[in-house]
């Protein structure tokens, strides 16, 4: 299965391959960026399929807390030491953290070299690996330093998902739920009824999510409008992750909580029915995802929104669902209305 992304009025683009890893062929030097856990589980599978002139491995620490400029420096140092040039290629082999960091390193090494995404987590396959968002975190928030830099190809393999821990697998489902709530009511209904034990259903889930992401990115590559709707749940989630030091919740878990918080705000504003909000909450519960976060200080939580990348001139832009299958951006919500919702989570 192949899905094509055409960008900048079809001047360039790339393919997302689903269960076609054997097609991967690269000219020139190749650096595979991964972590010890993924390497131990899946590196041999990749190397058995990879056709390239020369490769070497860059191993980085595992975890969101290492998604920072220090790790980027580590990657760049090894690229320089190994004398990669502009004809070389980086492979991001891992989850969303690896994808984001490798893409960012590729975008700044010698002002840009090729990179390929091979996501090994469900979260990365349904969302993070497609679309060209790259970056790292800092003390001010999540993904505050980064770039838009598209991969040359993406390879999604269902077999890599078999080794995911229960919690990590479910965290990936949060991003699939996000896709469904914002753009695809039929997909939402399918998720309500499907069991994901079968590999064909997993492949269908990835395919459907990638199709949504691809069409959105084609229409709005640099997130000036439509693509911003895919940040549903993330305005709240990024604050939660930053407050908890990126250690208490996996990203998808924080997004699940963020979606529930956003839905509470939507209901209060009359954008969403309580019935739809409950259906979303029940679907998240079906996938054993959290929906509640105990706030310490609602005012401090709100002030953290000011560092959100969508905030402009002191106006917080909230991505809210106005019914399953649809979403809107609102930048005229009163602070008091948001504070009242936040108090429900104390």
Swiss-Prot record:
<feature type="binding site">
    <location>
        <begin position="120"/>
        <end position="121"/>
    </location>
    <ligand>
        <name>NAD(+)</name>
    </ligand>
</feature>
<keyword id="KW-0963">Cytoplasm</keyword>
<keyword id="KW-0520">NAD</keyword>
<dbReference type="GO" id="GO:0005737">
    <property type="term" value="C:cytoplasm"/>
</dbReference>
<dbReference type="InterPro" id="IPR030960">
    <property type="entry name" value="DHQS/DOIS_N"/>
</dbReference>
<comment type="function">
    <text>Catalyzes the conversion of 3-deoxy-D-arabino-heptulosonate 7-phosphate (DAHP) to dehydroquinate (DHQ).</text>
</comment>
<dbReference type="Pfam" id="PF01761">
    <property type="entry name" value="DHQ_synthase"/>
</dbReference>
<dbReference type="InterPro" id="IPR016037">
    <property type="entry name" value="DHQ_synth_AroB"/>
</dbReference>
<keyword id="KW-0479">Metal-binding</keyword>
<keyword id="KW-0862">Zinc</keyword>
<dbReference type="GO" id="GO:0009073">
    <property type="term" value="P:aromatic amino acid family biosynthetic process"/>
</dbReference>
<keyword id="KW-0456">Lyase</keyword>
<feature type="binding site">
    <location>
        <begin position="62"/>
        <end position="67"/>
    </location>
    <ligand>
        <name>NAD(+)</name>
    </ligand>
</feature>
<keyword id="KW-0057">Aromatic amino acid biosynthesis</keyword>
<dbReference type="GO" id="GO:0009423">
    <property type="term" value="P:chorismate biosynthetic process"/>
</dbReference>
<dbReference type="GO" id="GO:0003856">
    <property type="term" value="F:3-dehydroquinate synthase activity"/>
</dbReference>
<feature type="binding site">
    <location>
        <position position="142"/>
    </location>
    <ligand>
        <name>NAD(+)</name>
    </ligand>
</feature>
<feature type="binding site">
    <location>
        <position position="133"/>
    </location>
    <ligand>
        <name>NAD(+)</name>
    </ligand>
</feature>
<feature type="binding site">
    <location>
        <begin position="96"/>
        <end position="100"/>
    </location>
    <ligand>
        <name>NAD(+)</name>
    </ligand>
</feature>
<dbReference type="GO" id="GO:0008652">
    <property type="term" value="P:amino acid biosynthetic process"/>
</dbReference>
<feature type="binding site">
    <location>
        <begin position="160"/>
        <end position="163"/>
    </location>
    <ligand>
        <name>NAD(+)</name>
    </ligand>
</feature>
<dbReference type="InterPro" id="IPR056179">
    <property type="entry name" value="DHQS_C"/>
</dbReference>
<keyword id="KW-0028">Amino-acid biosynthesis</keyword>
<feature type="binding site">
    <location>
        <position position="175"/>
    </location>
    <ligand>
        <name>Zn(2+)</name>
    </ligand>
</feature>
<feature type="binding site">
    <location>
        <position position="251"/>
    </location>
    <ligand>
        <name>Zn(2+)</name>
    </ligand>
</feature>
<feature type="binding site">
    <location>
        <position position="234"/>
    </location>
    <ligand>
        <name>Zn(2+)</name>
    </ligand>
</feature>
<dbReference type="GO" id="GO:0046872">
    <property type="term" value="F:metal ion binding"/>
</dbReference>
<protein>
    <recommendedName>
        <fullName>3-dehydroquinate synthase</fullName>
        <ecNumber>4.2.3.4</ecNumber>
    </recommendedName>
</protein>
<dbReference type="Pfam" id="PF24621">
    <property type="entry name" value="DHQS_C"/>
</dbReference>
<dbReference type="InterPro" id="IPR030963">
    <property type="entry name" value="DHQ_synth_fam"/>
</dbReference>
<dbReference type="GO" id="GO:0000166">
    <property type="term" value="F:nucleotide binding"/>
</dbReference>
<keyword id="KW-0170">Cobalt</keyword>
<comment type="pathway">
    <text>Metabolic intermediate biosynthesis; chorismate biosynthesis; chorismate from D-erythrose 4-phosphate and phosphoenolpyruvate: step 2/7.</text>
</comment>
<dbReference type="InterPro" id="IPR050071">
    <property type="entry name" value="Dehydroquinate_synthase"/>
</dbReference>
<keyword id="KW-0547">Nucleotide-binding</keyword>
<comment type="similarity">
    <text>Belongs to the sugar phosphate cyclases superfamily. Dehydroquinate synthase family.</text>
</comment>
